[in-house]
Amino acid sequence: MDFLDIAGKNFLVFGVANKKSIAFAVGEVLSEAEAKVVYSVRSAARKESVSKFLPDADIFLCDVEREYEIKELAENISKKYPKIHGIVHSIAFANYEGGLKPFHETRKKDFLQSVDISCYSLVAIANAFKDLLDKKASVVTISISATKMAAEPYGFMAPVKAALDSTICFLAKSFSSFSEIRFNSVNPGLLKTSASAGIPGYLDYYLFAEQLTLRKKALTTKEVANTVAFLLSERASGINAQRIAIDCGMSVNYFDKDIITKATRV
């Protein structure tokens, strides 16, 4: 028996954009374990592009900014899948048009739109799918490791992700009144994804983060996906309302002697 024991179970994955997406890597790991993976993307154009590299996948449409579409998605999926055993929420958006600005110059509409798409969407999805989820299902969202640091390349996305981390605690508590459904976040360090490529100056931070890892090798999306798959399985039944950091030890290595030498020697 496969360790994860998820063969034949149904999982809904939000947020796949291309082969560099965390959502894509999660789908691969779940499929390798013989689970059924269902995808949700935000537009017909995205569905068309995703279908090119996932030709046999069952792909649904849902723009999470429109709450009625989330409800329609649950209804449409329920017609084909009587139970969903897990949901992966890999959705985030921040409008960096015009480049990164000092945090205090963040526009209200940009901040609130980011909260709506990146954070509130999880609440709306959980509510819409509560009757379709198996009573021991698992919901995993993708956050970031740097919500407590003023990491400039993330801009206002960091406090939005901090709100997301808090949200899982309240969802876990709320759902505990009628189920054993678990909510957790996976909080990776810096990754090479298409989304991160759009962040001004991100590459320099990514290369610096790689030097800070204990192994001196950057984190991969496959490593993040493996952790997500574990949390989705009942092997992780004791883990609920938790923030799981995956950063290859970066967060304990800020005083690495090689980094210090480079910074203090001219």
Regions found by a protein language model. Give the residues of each.
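Conserved SDR Rossmann-fold cofactor-binding beta-strand/turn motif
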Residues: 182-192, 232, 245-247
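A short C-terminal helix-loop "cap" of Rossmann-like NAD(P)-dependent dehydrogenase/epimerase domains
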Residues: 199-213, 262-265
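A conserved structural motif in NAD(P)-dependent oxidoreductases
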Residues: 213-224
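Short, small/polar-rich loop/turn modules that mediate ligand/substrate recognition or access, typified
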Residues: 177-182, 239-241
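Catalytic loop of short-chain dehydrogenase/reductase
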Residues: 15-24, 92-131, 135-178, 187-192, ...
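Canonical Rossmann dinucleotide-binding motif of NAD(H)/NADP(H)-dependent dehydrogenases/reductases
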Residues: 3-40
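Short C-terminal tail/terminal secondary-structure segment
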Residues: 240-266
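Conserved mid-core segment of classical short-chain dehydrogenase/reductases
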Residues: 62, 66-71, 75, 79-80, ...
